[in-house]
């Protein structure tokens, strides 16, 4: 990008009205959402205080209509029925299986044969032989069960026009309301992170009008009983110690297949009911509680398992899940409902309020927005292209990660934490060839870095099992992880065909997140204690995995491009060859990351770093096919599926950094050709990945086109595989539901507005000025530990603000104009459209 002007800035400024500073518990200052009055002032009188709410005009008919809530560990989906209400309850450690050794003692022999066949360019036979490297399937994410509420028959006569159901993203509270005659009934639900319980309040406008029954149920082995003295129901249950068969026919009722109750994970859930004075609670048949003639009732739900880490057999666990639940319920006895709500709100908003986004460009009336269900708004997006719906989906991604991944929890899996099946699609397992990584793409730019902590805990567990897999399967040092994992930190290849199972780059891709975490936070202690050890072990494996090829370059052999076949020279389908473009791109990224990390930590003289630097010079370049696109494989094979959903060979552009518009324009041009060749259709996660790729190319038109593709309302009873879209609760569709695209969408929108390296900051690099002509984004994070706020009008930058927790030297770039700036801690900078500092103040 041409440099038209440059100047050095060494003072700090206050970003007036865009940035408010709060102090978090750890002492870090963070910008929060501006008050609505300030938002109005910033947009010259335009009211930007649109509610961030998902709204529904009736009860759920399908699970993908239900409202998700969560506190990172506990989750629920709320159906919002009138005469009966269902909450599907999830707890993030409810899984099948036990710790197991899935290493393959016969793998080294098979590996040698596969490599021989690849060397002979017999790729079809190598693909067949590579099945011998496959292993056992992962275990399966389960559901605790359902909480059922049955209201008296009068509720069936509710006034349909009075019904409203909503999820407020600013408070993380779900609400259901309706009227029966002259009585208004309301329910509120939230999942408290500070108190580790799910809380509901149900109330009626007329005293004594609230009566209902409540009970537990589960498809897993379970037993429930009431404790009338404490107004409680306790459910105990157990998970299967071994997953159901992979190919179990759908016609078979899985709940009837017996299993050993004692070997798998044990779980418990407790519900306690509080009622107003004058109301009563009694036991029905020892299984249900009955509430009669109350003004209001508060439900407190706790759930837990005896999971004690991925290396402890459930039978050896010292954790009593029922006792855990009792303790959690007991710990909140001192709090009123208002207290519980305030504690929840303070915890949640500390994270959520760090970023706000306001886009204008639509004539959609505010009143119409509030009266129209979210599903109808999605349906009409193709015609009105309402930017407030983009705001909503962006913030929904942040809401969902805050709700499904918190310090100390498990990672957000393929469905976050929300699941209603004992056989969920793709086992609900973490998939490491795009899906798990995409879950966390927006955690750093979206300014919720704490939510990424479970990923590094998980990687530490993978590193332990991965050392066994690397040593036994491949005779290599370090650690490795493949395509699919589970709560037991499985690292060996999955079952089945090599096209998906044989992919030893899952751990390496995850390791790039460790370096990214450092670049966004500049947390040297994290890098030293957690990030670098993970990179070190991964790098050791990669160095051993690389072998010298006939062309003199180091190569990976065998190698696949995730889930994609090619046509071998003999005309047969194959997936196994050598040095797929993604393999090499990930290795280049990891090697660059560990070299950079070694410089920060003073480890440049380590033997490992010397080996890495020597290997870097021997890695093959990214190659361009004869049609001008990026090659997916080392050879220019015929691609039988040019519109394949994966775009793995473009990793080097995004989320990687080895291809850039500025430094490698020829490769960037080839990436553009590749994206056009691949096409725009695909599942949700593919769509959002392509949006981020186009944004990295600074192509606002195509980035926005991919954004619009996500707004396609999906009928869960008539799904079309691989076509993406949104369900009515704004869960993203593969179909079926996968949560990755919810997170990928937030990352892609952030990428359209701000891009960065540790030395460069690009403002509005892919802004669709004709679609979002006016806007404010507040609180996005950039590499270098910089927080960014931007205001633009009529498609042009007006002003922006920067602040950092440490000294940062950066180059600010906007439309070819660049300026050098040095940010000082405790200061905030405000710049105008010409990148000149216009105001200054201390924090």
UniProtKB/Swiss-Prot annotation:
Disrupted gene: phenotype observed: No visible phenotype. Higher abundance of fucosylated oligosaccharides and presence of unusual oligosaccharides.
Pfam families assigned to the protein according to its UniProt record, in alphabetical order: Glyco_hyd_65N_2, Glyco_hydro_95_C, Glyco_hydro_95_cat
pH dependence, entry free text: Optimum pH is 5.0.
Glycosites: 62, 253, 365, 605
Enzyme class: hydrolase
Compartmental location: Secreted, Extracellular space, Apoplast
Keyword Calcium assigned: no
Matching PANTHER family: ALPHA-L-FUCOSIDASE 2 (PTHR31084:SF0)
Biological function: Hydrolyzes alpha-1,2-linked fucose. Also active on fucosylated xyloglucan oligosaccharides. No activity with 3-fucosyllactose, p-nitrophenyl-alpha-I-fucopyranoside, lacto-N-fucopentaose II, lacto-N-fucopentaose III or alpha 1,6-fucosylated chitopentaose. Involved in apoplastic xyloglucan metabolism.
Record protein name field: Alpha-L-fucosidase 2
Name of the coding gene: FUC95A
